[in-house]
Amino acid sequence: MKSTNISRSFSKIKKEKRIALMPFLMAGDPDLETTAKILLELQANGADMIELGIPYSDPLADGPIIQLAASRALSAGTSPDRVFKMLFELRDQLTIPIILFTYSNPLINKGLEEFCLQASKVGVSGLVVPDLPLEEAEKLSDIAESKEIDLVLLVAPTTPKDRMKRIAATSNGFTYLVSVTGVTGERSSLEDNVGSLVQQLKDSSSSPIAVGFGISDVKHIEQVREWGADGAIVGSALVKRIANASIEMKVEEAGSFCKELRAATNEYFFK
């Protein structure tokens, strides 16, 4: 596996015998000024990497919480260019990898080369495109790699075993394991077969594995850690807390939740 910002972060975290905490945040919800403050607050409270969503009007992989966040962000005038501008202004302060989560349409509208070029200029380390099939990933992966950006691919519980191996072999930075069948959203419990999927991926690839979709609390992070995964992505639960907090408390609420989750990433014992 080649050395990138993301792979180096996972290597460092593994030496610390814990898993990576990777919160998801919707850019522009409620506005980009608040998003900038929350990004720094998450970093200060133990986030190892941050997945930053580019709002899109038809987010097929997302449940109602993140759909509403995207709608609010779009209503506030958030666009890829404005997100890039915000990240450029934070570039000297953000020291952890930023991974953009975007659907194909905003990428295509801007042009793959131009999107990746702008992302690179503002310090983006990774890219997740949930509606990009494996068969169409090679071109974007090559462009992203030329800009030192990892294109991260997703594996779902319903993905056939042979295809899962191909995705894990193609994904850069880490493999994103979707823990549930369906869309993003908070869950009271995680599906039992995810642990075996983690093992299958580890048997077929040296790439780190991060589990997302439905990871909502400390118990879920402990479960992800016990499965032997390398990272936990927390999205809807954080987005919901930010949405429910008053405008004065959104940044503080995000930070306190992140700090609580970070504590659960420790004591990761490798076999």
From Swiss-Prot:
Pathway linked to the protein: Amino-acid biosynthesis; L-tryptophan biosynthesis; L-tryptophan from chorismate: step 5/5
InterPro entries (UniProt xref): Aldolase_TIM, RibuloseP-bd_barrel, Trp_synthase_alpha_AS, Trp_synthase_suA
Pfam families: Trp_syntA
Entry annotated with the keyword Amino-acid biosynthesis: yes
A Gene Ontology cellular-component term: cytosol
Catalytic activity: (1S,2R)-1-C-(indol-3-yl)glycerol 3-phosphate + L-serine = D-glyceraldehyde 3-phosphate + L-tryptophan + H2O
Quaternary data: Tetramer of two alpha and two beta chains.
Purpose of the protein: The alpha subunit is responsible for the aldol cleavage of indoleglycerol phosphate to indole and glyceraldehyde 3-phosphate.
Record protein name field: Tryptophan synthase alpha chain
Species assigned in the record: Prochlorococcus marinus (strain NATL2A)
Gene this protein is translated from: trpA
